[in-house]
């Protein structure tokens, strides 16, 4: 599974 989501500039994006 992919790693959890991280807060980016706007919203969230998968760190994988």
Swiss-Prot record:
Keyword Iron among record annotations: no
Keyword Mitochondrion: no
Top-rank taxon, per record: Eukaryota
Keywords from the named record: Disulfide bond, Pyrrolidone carboxylic acid, Secreted, Toxin
Compartment annotation: Secreted
Cysteine disulfide links: 2-16, 3-12, 8-15
GO molecular function terms listed in the Swiss-Prot or TrEMBL record: toxin activity
Residues that bear Pyrrolidone carboxylic acid (Glu): 1
Expressing tissues: Expressed by the venom duct.
GO cellular component, one term: extracellular region
Family: Belongs to the conotoxin M superfamily.
Entry domain remark: The cysteine framework is III (CC-C-C-CC).
Function: Has a sleep-inducing effect in mice when injected intraperitoneally.
Protein name as it appears in the record: Conotoxin ar3i
Source organism of the structure: Conus araneosus (Cobweb cone)
């Amino acid at each position: 599974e992919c790693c959890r989501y991280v807060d980016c500039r706007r919203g969230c994006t998968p760190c994988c």
